Design a protein with these regions (language model features):
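Individual transmembrane alpha-helices with interfacial aromatic-anchor signatures
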Residues: 109-127
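Non-cytosolic membrane-interface motifs at loop->transmembrane helix junctions
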Residues: 43-47, 78-79, 109-115
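Membrane-interface helix-loop junction between the first two transmembrane segments
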Residues: 31-42
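Membrane-interfacial segments
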Residues: 39, 71, 102-105, 141-147
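Juxtamembrane loop segments immediately following a transmembrane helix
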Residues: 93-115
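Signature of small four-pass
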Residues: 13-27, 31, 48-101, 122-139
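Intrinsically disordered terminal tails
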Residues: 1-11, 110-113, 131-156
Length: 156
């Protein structure tokens, strides 16, 4: 089985999820840095940063599962629902940190600059999860088994 034998839809979904995986790992790194520094100094871990790392981790695990060829095909409509849930989680993350950092003046502070960049990574992830949701819905709609309701034999 070579690359030519793969369906174009699988290649597109895998490409989208590869970029989502990269963005999830980036998010974990950007927010995890502050969590690590707070832990090293004996301070508490802010729940907003923990939420960001959890959302990034859930997204990364989801992407790894989606790299298995049959998962996207077998899961069907569930994939679209789960992708939408992840979209909502990412939008919430963008909203929380966007409110905190978009209008913040960095004034040479590297931590604030990093968090301002993290906000845009969050938005990119959210939008890409929305695209993945719409693509999964389109794939499900096109490939669903639409047989007649009465006998179940005829394709409608």
């Amino acid at each position: 089985m070579g690359i030519k034998d793969l369906a174009i839809s699988y290649v597109v979904f895998s490409t989208i999820h590869f970029f989502l995986f990269a963005l999830a790992l980036t998010t974990i790194g950007l927010y995890g840095t502050d969590l690590h520094n707070a832990n090293k100094q004996g301070k508490y871990s802010d729940s907003k940063w923990v939420y960001a790392v959890v959302v990034g981790s859930i997204s990364a695990v989801t992407c790894v599962l989606y790299f298995i060829p049959f998962v996207l095909r077998v899961a069907g409509f569930v994939v679209a629902i789960w992708d939408f849930i992840l979209f909502v989680l990412w939008i919430a993350l963008f909203g929380v940190f966007g409110k905190m950092y978009i209008n913040e003046d960095a004034e040479g502070d590297g931590g604030v600059k990093r968090m301002k960049n993290a906000v845009w990574v969050d938005l990119a992830s959210a939008l890409l999860w929305l695209i993945a949701t719409l693509a999964a819905l389109g794939y499900w709609w096109k490939h669903r088994d639409n047989r007649s309701k009465f006998t179940g034999r005829a394709h409608v």
